[in-house]
Amino acid sequence: MEREDIIKFIAAHKAKFEQEFGLKRIGLFGSYARGEMREESDIDIVVEIEKPDLFHLIGIKQAIEEVLGTKVDIVRLRDTMNQTLRSRIERDVIYV
């Protein structure tokens, strides 16, 4: 799996995610975004959604995992999150 494959998938499904889950913004961060992925790496996704809902996060996560066949970690970007994690995300993120 290459970074470009993930970005293409997200771009192709972004409108669906916006409509179905209230997605405002989505991006790739972590090892795939940095080009440092290994065979055992998971896909790290950051999202901003209109009305935060656990089921929406799970829906986005499952949609990506089912097609790409790789474990996905999904993080909702918010003002009150751990600032160290937020800084790491903002350093690496590639918004689609």
Range-by-range predicted roles:
Residues 1-25, 34-39, 50-96:
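Catalytic core of pol beta-like nucleotidyltransferases
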Residues 31:
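P-loop (Walker A) phosphate-binding loop of NTP-binding proteins
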Residues 44-47:
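Short beta-strand->loop micro-motif that forms the acidic, two-metal-ion catalytic signature
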